[in-house]
């Protein structure tokens, strides 16, 4: 079960990151999937940002099974092959953690449902977010 918390600061500066971490730390007891951020970014609106994972965070008492990093690499190769088959161009690629990736992609969004279903048909792969301005970032515990 997840929980939702938010911040709005109007006309003043604040240490938003620290405040968000405090709220997320308070939600951490709800389980390994409870901790994340949703951020709006300033983009040109042309490309999609896809955040996805090819494995699980096995820390923090997770029930997930520890996998060798090579398993993540194999799943990533399959994702890349599927993207190629769908006519997607990877503009930028970041590996945030061994199991967590962020792609900026160029894609003529014919059918995002079909796109998502194809990518998530790969065992162990889950799209966390896909959009042109909002990113959902879920990479583990709230405490840094």
Show where each model-derived region lies.
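N-terminal segments that mediate ammonia production and transfer
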Residues: 1-141
